[in-house]
């Protein structure tokens, strides 16, 4: 859900994480795969470029939730073996064919993943038209090359046997959620759906905001405490039977003493430039409308003069619009999350 449009002025802020919340035997997974999980957790710490926004609230300083989400995703890309947007298709993990994925990131055993898709499309009890399934869901060129190379080795076993995949795999699905509080229900639904598709999910990681971080994003975003309560409810009623780690993302500075003066100055300057350009464009439109009306009743000589004036105004309007679009793109106009 979105509210008033805001510009997001780029600044760098320090972030950290609080102690992760481990649900449904997630502690066992953490102890077994501590090195990998710590690598992921450590990637969430440090200074990140985010978008500063001004808000009409008690605490006027804020940051764009979208910019924070993008910064986290970009940092996670540096972890070996991690995948970005991920869908669960017939129990396998695949990148979305188009648009956003069901999950923000994943780490999974690539060979075992191919085994599962092979069994579904070409195994002993495979679905009919397995080739069509593959063509529909494996669109990424690099992934298709790996799949085709894998299939060459298995071609003689089509519809004769299922593949014996490794049992010592460790698969992670994860979500970074700084959206409206109601998104936690959608996220849980996606997890339950993936479980029902027989995906091998060894750990689900959910990154949400602490109360401190919510103060500079919005009180309406998914918070750690609410996420913990909702996930625990669904674990208790057996909708979710996978280990869940909730990671509290926090700011690493004192809100009451942090100096935002440079960010405020830059934000005000850009806001003023955008407002001035919008006013010029609005004035151009009104002036063009007035001149068009005048031209209708003018004699031919006067009409030519008016036509040239309109042409100049349109060129000026076009130039101003281009400049405005460039500014908005550079400073990433973002949606501010509405308070609930």
Residue ranges and their predicted role:
Residues 1-97, 268, 272-340:
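Nuclease-adjacent, charged terminal/linker segments that flank catalytic cores
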Residues 40, 68, 72, 76, ...:
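Generic structural hydrophobic/aromatic packing signal, biased to beta-strands
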Residues 58-60, 75-168, 180-189, 196:
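Active-site metal-binding core of divalent-cation-utilizing nuclease and nuclease-like domains
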Residues 64, 101, 223-224:
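A diffuse structural propensity rather than consistent per-protein peaks
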Residues 108-141, 255-291:
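Internal, charge-rich low-complexity segments
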Residues 156-245:
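Conserved binding-pocket/active-site segment within a compact domain
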Residues 210-286, 319, 330-340:
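Domain-level recognition of nuclease-like catalytic cores that cleave nucleotide substrates
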